[in-house]
């Protein structure tokens, strides 16, 4: 059998031990204030403490002391209460500080809850806004409540008045959250709207009236190391949320073309300066928290169990860094960056490379670009193993073996690099050097035979003419 309330009672007992200072073996100092806790609870709740305590696991007899200067004592009090009770008191004043501290301590669950809290307060879509501000005559003068509404309300929150053309009802004294501004409260633009768009927009602005319900403390699910407590509504509010989902599905059947959507977007109302300043301030706090989260040290051994769910089963992770690949061959190639292995040597110069394509590119650009070949044996030749030969106006290169066969191996080659070896005239060359002499003789003999034939024909014609004249 499984008892669902066992872990709740266990957390309560641990929290009671912490408050009575029983078996506390970890001391945390923040702004000069000391907090006492159990290292096992901190180890299971925070990636930072997991790394810190795993390095000092040998000194189990003495208590561990850690000092933090990156967040305030009130912020750490809220986080420590969350660790031991599963309840996170979030509000518009402390959500950024709590998120920054959770980022530093590597508490991913608290970060996700803070992001959801901020998103719900800033990025409410049009459907939720219209459903939130469209109330019936029965709700006149009543106070509404929404998700995390208690955390946003302040004593100086302004009252809003709203009149609807459909019902003609008047709502006064409604305590709205400061970051949210209704579209119906903004002044209309100068451009008139199309009648069809107005009718379709009215159909979207007529949801069922919402009945406000008393607020209660409900934890947001079972998270690792606890859960965040936020202000939610009772069962009636849950039913109203389900009704809103059904109406949202019905509203999806209304087809609005792309041009109409662009027209509606072009006729939007300007935002109030109060909302713009609040959104800019929140955006700056969020960016600061994200930068702090990116600046955290990377933990390999201590925090190896954190974030493993984000890596799919079909990926391979590098044991030296956070790089992940899809194929095992890519991981093997990536490991050469850490090991320094270069398994691909160049046969021409002996230089080694980590990747085969780098070797191929090196060979093509260095060794095969302007490749020199011996004119006689057709083998590769360099400036060291060959010599440039000039035969009249023609220049080519021969290797030392071919030069030795031609009898030019004793010639002094101490010339400049640009000065070629000039061959002697044809009548002074040796027969072994003139390797095309046979071809020239054959061509010359053929030409001589043709000349003889032509000469014989010419002589025979002249004799015939002389005989006729006689």
From Swiss-Prot:
One of its GO terms (molecular function) is zinc ion binding. A zinc finger (C2H2-type) spans 316-338, 344-367. Pfam families: BTB, zf-C2H2. It is found in: Nucleus. Its main location: nucleus. SUPFAM superfamilies: beta-beta-alpha zinc fingers, POZ domain. It comes from the Eukaryota. InterPro entries: BTB/POZ_dom, SKP1/BTB/POZ_sf, Znf_C2H2_sf, Znf_C2H2_type, ZnFinger_BTB_dom_contain. Keywords: DNA-binding, Metal-binding, Nucleus, Phosphoprotein, Repeat, Transcription, Transcription regulation, Zinc, Zinc-finger. Residues 24-92 form the BTB domain. One of its GO terms (cellular component) is nucleus. PANTHER family: AGAP004733-PA, ZINC FINGER AND BTB DOMAIN-CONTAINING PROTEIN 8A. May be involved in transcriptional regulation. This is Zinc finger and BTB domain-containing protein 8A. It comes from Xenopus tropicalis.
């Amino acid at each position: 059998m499984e008892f669902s309330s066992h872990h709740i009672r266990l957390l309560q007992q641990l929290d009671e031990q912490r408050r009575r200072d029983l078996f506390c073996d970890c001391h945390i100092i923040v702004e000069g204030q000391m907090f006492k806790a159990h290292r096992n609870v901190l180890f299971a709740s925070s990636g930072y403490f997991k790394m810190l305590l795993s390095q000092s696991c040998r000194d189990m007899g003495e208590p561990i002391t850690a000092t933090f200067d990156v967040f305030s004592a009130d912020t750490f009090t809220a986080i420590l209460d969350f660790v031991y009770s599963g309840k996170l008191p979030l509000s518009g004043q402390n959500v950024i500080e709590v998120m920054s501290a959770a980022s530093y301590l590597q508490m991913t669950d608290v970060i996700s809850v803070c992001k959801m809290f901020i998103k719900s307060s800033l990025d409410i879509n049009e459907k939720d806004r219209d459903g939130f501000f469209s109330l019936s005559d029965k709700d006149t003068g009543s106070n509404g409540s929404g998700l995390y509404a208690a955390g946003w309300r302040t004593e100086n929150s302004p009252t809003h008045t709203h009149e609807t053309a459909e019902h003609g009802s008047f709502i006064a004294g409604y305590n709205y959250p400061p970051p949210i501004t209704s579209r119906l409260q903004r002044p209309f633009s100068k451009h008139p709207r199309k009648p069809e768009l107005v009718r379709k927009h009215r159909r979207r602005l007529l949801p069922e009236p919402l009945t406000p319900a008393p607020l209660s403390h409900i934890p947001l699910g079972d998270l690792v190391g606890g859960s965040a407590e936020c202000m939610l509504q009772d069962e009636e509010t849950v039913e109203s949320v389900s009704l809103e989902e059904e109406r949202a599905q019905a509203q999806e059947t209304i087809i609005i073309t792309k041009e109409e959507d662009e027209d509606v977007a072009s006729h939007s109302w300007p935002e109030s300066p109060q909302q713009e300043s609040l959104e800019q301030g929140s955006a700056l706090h969020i960016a600061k928290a994200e930068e702090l989260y990116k600046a955290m040290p990377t933990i390999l051994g201590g925090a190896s169990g954190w974030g493993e769910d984000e890596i799919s089963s079909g990926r391979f992770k590098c044991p030296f860094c956070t790089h992940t690949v899809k194929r095992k061959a890519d991981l093997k190639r990536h490991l050469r960056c850490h090991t320094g292995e270069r398994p691909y040597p160049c046969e021409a110069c002996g230089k080694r490379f980590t990747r085969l394509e780098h070797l191929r590119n090196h060979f093509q650009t260095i060794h095969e670009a302007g490749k020199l070949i011996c004119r006689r044996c057709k083998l590769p030749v360099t400036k060291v193993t060959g010599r440039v030969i000039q035969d009249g106006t023609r220049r080519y290169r021969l290797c030392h073996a071919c030069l030795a066969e031609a009898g030019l191996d004793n010639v002094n080659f101490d010339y400049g690099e640009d000065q070629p070896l000039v061959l002697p005239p044809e009548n002074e060359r040796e027969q072994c050097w003139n390797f095309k002499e046979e071809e020239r003789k054959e061509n010359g003999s053929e030409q001589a035979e043709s000349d003889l034939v032509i000469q014989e024909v010419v002589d025979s014609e002249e004799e015939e003419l002389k005989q006729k004249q006689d």
